Amino acid sequence: MKDMNLHSAFNLKMKELKDNEQASTYLSYQSALKSLESFGGTYIPLERITVDWLKRCERFWLSKGKSYSSISIYFRALKCILNRAIQDGILKESSFPFGKNKYEIPEGCGRKLALTLADIKKVMSYQDGTKDIEEFRDLWVFSYLCNGINFMDLLFLQYSNIVDGEICFVRSKTSRTAKHSKEIHAIITPEMWNIIHKWGNPRINPQTYIFKYADGTENAFERVRLVRRIVTKCNRRLKKIAQNTGISQLTTYTARHSFATVLKRAGAKTSYISESLGHSNLAVTENYLAYFEKEERIRNAQLLTDFNI
């Protein structure tokens, strides 16, 4: 155990994740290890990971086109690995490189991911005569209207999740970690009912999946692979819609940000938006709304020389 290196430490953690069927987290750690080894080589001694090493690693990743969001994910995984090594007596606490006055993990900046209502109208009304585009456009619309539901949750919704005209679900992302998982409630709008009737499975029993993509036999890793496949297909179609409508960026992820930002622009309280998204705290929601805050600053700055007021 004393000779444990980064590769073996990650593999130990990944085995636990695999045994617990935490597929998404497993794949996230796998990606982090691959990226760390692309900089530092294989079998990196834990003691080699210093503040300077982390700074050089960050610069290396940025030069390769990695985003700060990705860097943050990789380093959070590494931080957990090193914390575990300290707890197990493998690494001295004084060697821990993260924290105040050491290396601080960068936060993903608030990128403009949300669409305006005008752009959302373009998406919802877009037609090119093909069922292929129509299906994945409708999936995006459903995600947007259903509180920005993540595709991991959307594809595995069952008819039992429909209660009194609402879709009620717990986010798979937080169901394992949160002590008291928050149930999200999304009113089913007429547009959502139309999408269910158009693309959904007929209701056989409460456990019937609303949509046709899953069959219930998938294990944890197959579920993740299924979601990634559908998301990839959806994003390809969304890219075509964006190109043909003049929308700068349209992906499955923009549905969630658009839901939050449209409500904020309409005057909804951040606490309500946070609850609707199923966030654990307001700080997470505020990060979603970071670009909205920039828009506010731009408008307010323009007021300073608006002599027509």
PLM features: residue spans?
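Short, basic (Lys/Arg/His-rich) helix/loop patches that form interaction surfaces
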Residues: 232-275
